[in-house]
């Protein structure tokens, strides 16, 4: 961004920063604290800490669009970094997306029950859906009766994520998750049945979170089209790495197999390089 500033660009970063230092090289920055929270997150707006009510993906997009529309010098070229928290753990969907994909059954990956034979380092990773994915923190089984307990050390964190919601957010959340919690407690799942139940819950929430990102990327593209920016702007859509969606029995990304190593990237370059894969 500093080089772009020197070339006459206005620069901005909005959303996830997740570094110990304040951003430099930006004319405007409004960043989440740490990796941020999905609900009612705190932002640091050019040094000033503020809590904003709402859902992080929507808020981050709102702030970016506000800068594009109201806060930049429209006589200058710009570079905007729009960094979403989603789909970072713990994959908390927006309340409007909670019922999406409810009837979808996701195919279990062929390597889901990987035994890691001959691969000691892989066997020691703490991101196994069966043994490391927390029922409360990751899978939202924070029952009101406080009967579901876990051994990962993350249970209290999971309940705190719920407690930071507004009453309206909690009401929508409870409407969706309370019946799931009730059924889960009645089923008393173990073994393979529990493992695959956890996988389905993980996938449902992950895809809902991705849906919110997709919708908000669409909001930005719609704005750029309506404002006449779309055909004069290079757009890069990417991530910091791939992710495990049950392959090798894992969630997260911290092991360099193909699924984690591959990094998605799309570039829209009007009038530039011809599209290809």
Task: Label the model's feature ranges.
Residues 1-277:
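Formylglycine-dependent sulfatase
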């Amino acid at each position: 961004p500093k080089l772009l500033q020197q070339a006459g660009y206005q620069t901005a970063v909005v959303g996830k920063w997740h570094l110990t230092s304040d951003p430099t090289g930006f004319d405007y920055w409004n960043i989440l604290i740490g990796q941020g929270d999905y609900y009612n997150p705190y932002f640091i707006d050019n040094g000033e800490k503020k809590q904003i009510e709402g859902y992080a993906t929507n808020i981050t997009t709102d702030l970016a669009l506000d800068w594009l529309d109201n806060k930049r010098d429209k006589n200058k070229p710009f570079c905007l970094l729009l960094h979403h928290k989603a789909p970072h753990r713990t994959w908390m969907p927006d309340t409007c997306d909670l019922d999406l994909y409810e009837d979808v059954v996701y195919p279990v990956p062929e390597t889901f029950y990987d035994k890691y034979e001959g691969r000691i380092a892989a066997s020691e990773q703490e991101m196994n859906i069966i043994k490391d994915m927390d029922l409360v923190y990751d899978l939202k089984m924070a029952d009101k009766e406080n009967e579901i307990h876990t051994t990962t050390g993350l249970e209290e964190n999971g309940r705190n994520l719920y407690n930071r919601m507004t009453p309206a957010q909690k009401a929508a959340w409870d409407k969706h998750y309370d019946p799931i919690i009730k059924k889960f407690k009645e089923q008393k799942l173990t073994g393979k049945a529990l493992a695959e139940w956890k996988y389905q819950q993980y996938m449902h929430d992950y895809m809902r979170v991705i849906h919110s990102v997709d919708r908000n990327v669409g909001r930005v593209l719609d704005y750029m089209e309506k404002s006449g920016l779309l055909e004069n702007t290079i757009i890069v859509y990417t991530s910091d790495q791939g992710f495990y969606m049950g392959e090798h029995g894992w969630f997260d990304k911290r092991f360099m197999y193909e699924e984690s190593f591959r990094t998605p990237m799309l570039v829209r370059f009007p009038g530039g390089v011809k599209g290809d894969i």
